């Protein structure tokens, strides 16, 4: 025989759990607000604390939250910020304090942070709120926002190191209740402050936390632009031009940018500039050909012509190229802020010319090579060596003979295998031809 056992809950405990003390809470708030207005703030707070205890012990979360928030509100409205800090700590540490009540007083106090003009009092309130919210998951979002505010204050004061230290340790990616958009905003701010503090490695690690699929959503277009601007700043530090071009390409593919013609064309200009500044590679060549086919490029014909010069297998004379493009390129930010931009562009022109020469020449004298490149013998040899090291071209330079060779030396085994394959193909063709001739003889009965 099975006997059903029910939890031993006393009627007194059950009644306590089911109590609704909202009428008592409302009445207490109203009466003690009037009492506080008459100048008896301390007495009003004591009365409210008694009511708060009654509601807390009855586990009436809404009423407890309302009373606790009312206490903080009365202290602030009376201009007693010292009492605000004191009662925040008191209420958060009361025995068996309900989570909703702690969350209510933290959220109520956060409203006052923006309203307080005295910086010392503001910092004291932020410090109190961060202390009582430390280690409490149910107010982790509020703590993160307070930390961000504190970091901004330090940044405005010029203390970049402290601002970065405060903000960079936030692990908002683990916050389950924080919205994706707010998380990305935190990541972007963390990246920015880390780069302001010259901590580019940490900025990269934070940037990798951002989910690109979330950025692609329509409601996050502004965040997508802000994020890639920070990534551009990061890659600019190491002059990684191809990655900068890819970042601008991501901005270019944003619907809000596509609708804004001036911004679209300016972004396209940046893409063109950074593509031609990028070192020669398969990725660079692919990107250059893709960008060249963009329809809006016809509205900025000089940039299309610029890409075409690097797309066409013809030599580019640096002096003519420089005079033709200097006025336009000097107006762009990269050539104003990046001291090595023109030198890097000159290197790209030289690399392009070497690739053109390697296409049309199997062998060329080093003197003629230097003449075509407008370089000295040593400079031309260095550039050729760099391209060979990068596996962009194949070349050998015979210094005593003064000859540069751009054709690869075939491996004897590969040559022998190719010859054997060709002979096999030839014999197969002879055999097939013989069969066809014999068939014609038979069809026409020719002996």
UniProtKB/Swiss-Prot annotation:
GO terms for cellular component: cytoplasm; proteasome regulatory particle, lid subcomplex. Pfam families: PCI, PSMD12-CSN4_N, RPN5_C. The keyword Cytoplasm does not apply. Disulfide bonds: none annotated. InterPro entries: PCI_dom, PSMD12-CSN4-like_N, PSMD12/CSN4, RPN5_C, WH-like_DNA-bd_sf, WH_DNA-bd_sf. Residues 240-411 form the PCI domain. Belongs to the proteasome subunit p55 family. This is 26S proteasome non-ATPase regulatory subunit 12. It comes from Dictyostelium discoideum (Social amoeba). The gene is psmD12.
